[in-house]
Design a protein with these regions (language model features):
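Class I (Rossmann-like) S-adenosyl-L-methionine-dependent methyltransferase catalytic domain
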Residues: 1-9, 29, 33-34, 48-136
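Local beta-strand N-terminus motif with an aromatic residue
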Residues: 15-16
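A conserved beta-strand element that flanks and buttresses the S-adenosyl-L-methionine
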Residues: 19
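Conserved sequence/active-site signature of Rossmann-fold short-chain dehydrogenase/reductase
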Residues: 23
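A short glycine-rich, Lys/Arg-flanked "PGG" loop and its adjoining helix->strand segment in the class I
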Residues: 33-45
């Protein structure tokens, strides 16, 4: 079954919180959009999503260009970059504006973004970027 066809096995409005840690860093755009819609469906109104990404903001782009990040992101795709084009789901980085847009299209709002250490090479709360959202 393609990821875009998977229906979460829970009823509508089942959860107050969804954790998607190191999930979206392995999903291609269509699957990512579908999973966000499924997350919205299974969250109660006001429910939260805590998710992680590799975000290609200015600092992320600079880190990738330095060649010092892991994963490396070298193969362009629509809205982002892949770590390995032969194994696309091995690692995916996305443009933050697109992530905010698809959250909104799925009926979720982004409430907070925390920068990950993958691009700062400093101490921090998470290796990957954290995106916190809410079901409106």
């Amino acid at each position: 079954m393609a990821p875009e066809e998977y229906v979460f096995p829970w009823p509508d409005e089942s959860f107050d919180l969804t954790l998607a840690i190191s999930l979206f860093t392995h999903l291609l755009p269509g699957a990512l959009q579908h999973y966000l819609r499924e997350i919205r469906r299974t969250l109660r109104p006001g429910g939260r999503i805590y998710s992680t990404f590799f975000l290609l903001d200015e600092r992320g782009k600079a880190a990738v260009a330095s060649g010092l990040t892991y994963p490396t992101f070298t193969a362009p795709i629509e809205h982002g970059l892949l770590h390995d084009p032969l194994v696309p789901e091995d690692g995916v980085a996305y443009e933050p504006d697109w992530i905010c847009r698809i959250f909104e299209e799925a009926g979720l709002g982004v409430t907070r973004v925390y920068e990950g250490t993958w691009k700062t090479f400093a101490e921090g709360r998470s290796y990957q970027d954290v995106v916190v959202g809410v079901r409106w």
